[in-house]
Amino acid sequence: MKVIILLLSSLISLSADQIQGRLKIALLRVSFPEGDYPGFTGSGNFLFDANDLCSNKTIDPGPHDKNFFQSQLVAVNNYFENVSYGAFGIDTTYSTIFPKNNQDSYLIDQRMNYYNELGKENDHEKRITELLKDAVVAAYARDSIDLGSFDLVAVIHPGLGQDFDLPFLDPTPEDIPSTYVDENMVNMYFKDEIRSGNSIINKGIILPESQNIAIMDEALASAINSPCDLQFSVTGTWALMIGFAIGLPPLWELDSGASGVGIFALMDQGSNNLRGIVPSRPNPWTRIYAGWEKPTII
């Protein structure tokens, strides 16, 4: 899985041996002007219709509304509570999905392929940081939300994440990559500019609506042999991005992309285990680092 990850920064009790407590997340659903974007999955808005292409074997079926994302939040909380033995989880009581209407989003006045546009590779880091800024600004402009009371801001965008090495030529290379936007990125491009009321937002994560090629783009699915074999849940992606945000170190080589421990750890390639529905546990080293396990000295 390809993920943009820069230097890690802290969030709540994030020194080694102390990743504990309940993370309160503000999840901002954003959409873009609808249109035909050949390099991007979908039309710019969320999938609100059911798609029965894979019948009762569909992973993360529509509608992708507030209720759907709430269920994903519960799933990720269950995952972290399990792997941390109850030490860490998501505050599912006070974490909030915005806007509050079930099928709604904040419309960003920017074409959606702008944030990962082909031919603009040198601008990708700035533009993905700009997406965090655009989402926060749009949410405050409409609902006057002060996000300073939350531990983490997550932006949910329509379409797939540009996160996989596909076994064929990628037909949608401008999909937005799942990203942890850290404080260094924000300070480099928009220092003190991402404001929500009286609060300055200096980090966040970018999450896709789905990782299921089969249901997200009918034209794309029809051009692929056995599209239902390319289904993945977004649960693993969400768990991985939250892992970065709480300070779990990546376990692959950042410069080359070479895997360190493979599918046996969340913070390497384990986020897509069992098609992303049941991500791999953080490996023993990571659990010790987080304070969720105690090492046995022999």
List each model region and its residues.
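Extracellular hydrolytic enzyme modules, especially secreted metalloproteases
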Residues: L152-A154, P158-I298
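Short consensus segments that form the blades of beta-propeller domains
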Residues: D17-Q18, D146, S256-A258
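Active-site-proximal segments of metallohydrolase catalytic domains
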Residues: N67-I215, A219
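N-terminal module-boundary/linker segments of secreted carbohydrate-active enzymes
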Residues: S15-N67, K133
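Loop/turn elements at helix/coil->beta-strand transitions in domains of secreted/extracellular proteins
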Residues: G21-A26, D146-V153, G262-I263
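Structured segments of extracytoplasmic/periplasmic soluble domains
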Residues: P33, D49, L53-N56, Y79-N82, ...
